[in-house]
């Protein structure tokens, strides 16, 4: 009996490698980024604010846990998430943390702002069908091109304040970014409101949109329309 228990413990130790790889906020930042598409190590370091050594070490930990895969192109190393199941796991970890850890809910409210600023996917779909909103993707251009909500205009968050005038017409703005904890959409709400515009944010993001099986377009930005 003890031998059987030891074998099971050894098996679960292997399973626990996944949990160990996830048990670091910096690694979750990387997964958040890679859920949007493949990136070179240097780009990952820049986007997450890590130095190259730290980013590389965290990528190796994620790879050891089976969560990311790598390929080499010339002298550059590229990483991507290992599969859609990894994206689902990452999204579920956030849901579980939000539901069961009070500190997470408090921190999320501090980062994301009021729930009154957000609309659900169902509400977005209804209002978009009715022509009531202008949907703005505030992620970087390369993430937009890798996959975006159909009909969304791409204005990266760093450009939004200078380009709000391009969003003409009387429709409300809805901003979205990477996922439920992405800070770019809440920042977009503040920027647009400071300019006197009516704006909401999607209460999750591109990650959850994909996982819900909703349509995704790829390619260069669409025109702004009205």
From Swiss-Prot:
It comes from the Bacteria. GO terms for molecular function: DNA binding; DNA-binding transcription factor activity; thiosulfate-cyanide sulfurtransferase activity. One of its GO terms (biological process) is response to antibiotic. Pfam families: HTH_5, Rhodanese. Residues 129-218 form the Rhodanese domain. NCBIfam families: HTH_metalloreg. Part of a regulatory network that coordinates tolerance to the antitubercular drug bedaquiline. The active site is at 177 (cysteine persulfide intermediate). The keyword Protein biosynthesis does not apply. Residues 41-64 bind DNA. Contains an N-terminal HTH arsR-type DNA-binding domain and a C-terminal rhodanese-like domain. Transmembrane segments: none annotated. Residues 7-101 form the HTH arsR-type domain. This is HTH-type transcriptional regulator Rv0324. Disruption phenotype: Knockout mutant is hypersensitive to bedaquiline. Deletion of the gene does not affect sensitivity to capreomycin, pretomanid and rifampicin. InterPro entries: ArsR-like_HTH, HTH_ArsR_DNA-bd_dom, HTH_MetalResp_TranReg, Rhodanese-like_dom, Rhodanese-like_dom_sf, Thiosulphate_STrfase_CS, WH-like_DNA-bd_sf, WH_DNA-bd_sf. Keywords: Antibiotic resistance, DNA-binding, Transcription, Transcription regulation.
